[in-house]
Amino acid sequence: MKHLHRFFSSDASGGIILIIAAVLAMLMANSGFTSGWYHAFLETPVQLRVGALEINKNMLLWINDALMAVFFLLIGLEVKRELMQGSLASLRQAAFPVIAAIGGMIVPALLYLAFNYSDPITREGWAIPAATDIAFALGVLALLGSRVPLALKIFLMALAIIDDLGAIVIIALFYTSDLSMVSLGVAAFAIVLLAVLNLCDVRRTGVYILVGVVLWTAVLKSGVHATLAGVIVGFFIPLKEKHGRSPAKRLEHVLHPWVAYLILPLFAFANAGVSLQGVTLDGLTSILPLGIIAGLLIGKPLGISLFCWLALRLKLAKLPEGTRFQQIMAVGILCGIGFTMSIFIASLAFGSVDPALINWAKLGILIGSLLSAVIGYSWLRTRLSPVV
């Protein structure tokens, strides 16, 4: 029990469980004994009906649309806390990770387009390498233990949070179609109600969650991706402490283990099961997986390092205290771990086009993320001071 408690107390535990879930999915999807069970689980129909309202989806879509909304709720809470009280609370504090995140989204997307611009179908996946998996990246960093400067951890967390926020904006602007104005009207009313609750300083989290469920349903029916509802709810839950209690911080504390140890591993298990049947060298070196691998492995660190270097040269920002530029470059490599967020965007980009494209995209994401994790860990390990 002591070893189990120590494992779950470690910052690396969430990343390790994610890896186990992804490997298990790959094994089950490629085993003659378990592939049928694996796909049957994902295709299991789940229906929810309240009066005339009906939501009928398979298990995979419930995981991607409903459970991931809880993950985005946690992201919303984290972003709000960092903006109001944390590492993004002042312009000077926020400048360096914001500039790094912008470079880390623009350059990978451009590199992907350099490979895929000639194909109008695969071109739609330009945002896939722009994402960072915050749980995986922090998990790999945590494997280095106390050798990692606190400022470097905060920089990676702030960068990844801004990156996630950028991914949310990209999803809202570029991966949304067939809008229902009635449902959008209901969603707008729910958002106004959340704002009123916040202005009236209503501190019961359950009320916000109840309105959030209405918002999620309306957004789902509107054609906008339903996970965005989670972020919106997170922004409106009160952060300010009263009588020593903060509803936002308390909910963040409650949600964190559920997201780290259940929701993200379940998402990884449901989405990382890529069949290797029919995979050839020609396929792996085709423009789609190559563009993703190049975007994650080369574009991410190049964009982050280049934009950070320019920010320092132009005196727009300064290095986090106690860090060196080579360590920032190593963190840039770790940010190439796209995994869950990249897979999520790939499912939006190609979900209604061709399942084979999603398969090739996932392979590119898995290879690019794995290489980024190994190289980033190795490079950073050689550039950190040993523990005395």
From Swiss-Prot:
Reaction catalysis annotation: Na(+)(in) + 2 H(+)(out) = Na(+)(out) + 2 H(+)(in)
GO CC terms: plasma membrane
Gene Ontology terms describing biological process: regulation of pH
Keywords: Antiport, Cell inner membrane, Cell membrane, Ion transport, Membrane, Sodium, Sodium transport, Transmembrane, Transmembrane helix, Transport
UniProt cross-references to InterPro entries, sorted A to Z: Na/H_antiporter_dom_sf, NhaA
Cellular compartment(s): Cell inner membrane
Membrane topology: Multi-pass membrane protein
Coiled-coil intervals, chain numbering: none
Transmembrane segments: 14-34, 59-79, 95-115, 125-145, 154-174, 179-199, 219-239, 254-274, 287-307, 328-348, 356-376
GO molecular function terms attached to this record: sodium:proton antiporter activity
Protein family membership: Belongs to the NhaA Na(+)/H(+) (TC 2.A.33) antiporter family.
Function: Na(+)/H(+) antiporter that extrudes sodium in exchange for external protons.
Protein name in UniProt: Na(+)/H(+) antiporter NhaA
Species, as recorded: Citrobacter koseri (strain ATCC BAA-895 / CDC 4225-83 / SGSC4696)
Gene: nhaA
